[in-house]
């Protein structure tokens, strides 16, 4: 009888990047006889704690003990989907045969600086290359995010409403207050605003100046799982380039995403949703301003601020009609 494999996946951060690993994890679990373990940071545990395709999760909260714990597992393979100094050190310490995702540094440089796109595919497809040695095939079932249905949130999620993630790692990745306000003013459905603590005041100002009085500010008030639950039950999800976009993609709900300094051409757009998805780009060029969106070559505050509110509204109506 053939021995069951034991495979360790590594991805430390962040929300979207971890969610984007889930098709590879699922396909490995279903296509080979293997125990699947996953190493990530403690603060991202909730993203995968309910994932039925992962047998054990290790959390990188104590580096003094994690190496000995992993050594005891006796892994056959390591699939490194982060490929940074820390993950490379772990591979060195464990001395296990490993396969790492390519960071495509040259290709990213050519795209950002010269508009030459040699990436030409989604990052999920790049992740799948790490398991070619196991003859793993993409089942094309998209992303996985398992959220418990019993989450209790003080909101009537059974009614029709829109969810809108107004956050972003950098100001240059966020729509402005007035852009959002101008859209919300003309939307008849209730709207929930989602983001972290940093956007609380941002959301409050939108509510203060908007004519639409059916807006709920959940910024900084919900866990990732609770936010995911609201997104899952909404009729449409609007978002900047955020990790929550990938969670929404796993639920196969309609998505409108907004792109400024980053661009879908980098390969991190919503992956394989079965419902409608519209990527709205500020500059009709496939050349990103920067890798993570911290710098804009067109406007100090970010070229995302040039996306017309009336076009956003048109796309909302297009999806909902």
Task: For each feature predicted by the language model, list its residue ranges.
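Donor-binding and catalytic core of enzymes assembling or modifying cell-surface/extracellular glycoconjugates
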Residues: 172, 176-261
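A short, glycine/small-residue-rich beta-strand->loop->alpha-helix junction that serves as a flexible
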Residues: 10-20, 47, 80, 169-176
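Short amphipathic alpha-helix
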Residues: 18-28, 43-46
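Conserved nucleotide-sugar phosphate-binding/catalytic loop shared by glycosyltransferases and other
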Residues: 35-66, 277-284
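Conserved nucleotide-diphosphate donor binding/catalytic pocket of glycan-assembly enzymes
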Residues: 58-144, 161-165, 262-265, 271
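Surface-exposed amphipathic alpha-helices with a cationic face
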Residues: 22-32, 184-185, 232
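Nucleotide-sugar donor-binding and catalytic loop/hinge architecture
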Residues: 1-5, 149-162
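Nucleotide-sugar donor-binding patch of glycosyltransferase catalytic domains
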Residues: 101-107, 214-218, 249-320
């Amino acid at each position: 009888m053939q021995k069951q494999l034991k495979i360790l996946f590594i991805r430390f951060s962040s929300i979207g990047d971890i969610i984007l690993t889930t098709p590879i994890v699922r396909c490995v679990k279903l296509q080979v006889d293997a125990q699947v373990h996953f190493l990530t940071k403690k603060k991202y545990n909730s993203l995968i704690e309910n994932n039925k395709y992962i047998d054990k999760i290790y959390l990188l909260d104590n580096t003094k003990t994690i190496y000995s714990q992993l050594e005891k597992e006796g892994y056959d393979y390591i699939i490194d989907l982060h490929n940074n100094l820390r993950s490379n050190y772990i591979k060195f310490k464990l001395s296990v045969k490993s396969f790492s995702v390519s960071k495509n540094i040259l290709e990213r440089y050519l795209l950002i600086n010269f508009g030459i796109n040699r990436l030409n595919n989604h990052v999920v497809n790049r992740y799948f290359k790490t398991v070619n040695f196991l003859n793993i095939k993409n089942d094309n079932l998209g992303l996985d995010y398992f959220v418990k249905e019993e989450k209790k949130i003080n909101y009537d999620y059974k009614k029709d409403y829109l969810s809108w993630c107004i956050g972003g790692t950098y100001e240059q990745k966020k729509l402005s207050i007035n852009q959002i306000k101008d859209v919300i003013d003309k939307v008849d459905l209730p709207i929930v605003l989602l983001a972290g603590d940093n956007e609380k005041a941002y959301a409050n100002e939108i509510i203060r100046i908007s004519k639409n009085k059916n807006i709920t500010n959940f910024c900084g008030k919900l866990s990732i799982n609770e936010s995911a639950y609201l997104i899952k039950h909404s009729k449409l999800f609007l978002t900047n380039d955020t990790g929550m976009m990938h969670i929404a993609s796993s639920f196969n709900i309609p998505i409108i995403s907004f792109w400024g300094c980053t661009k879908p051409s980098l390969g991190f757009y919503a992956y394989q949703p079965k419902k409608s998805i519209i990527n709205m780009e500020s500059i009709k060029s496939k050349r990103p301003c920067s890798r993570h969106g911290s710098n804009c070559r067109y406007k100090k505050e970010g070229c995302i601020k040039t996306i017309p509110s009336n076009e956003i509204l048109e796309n909302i109506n297009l999806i909902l009609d």
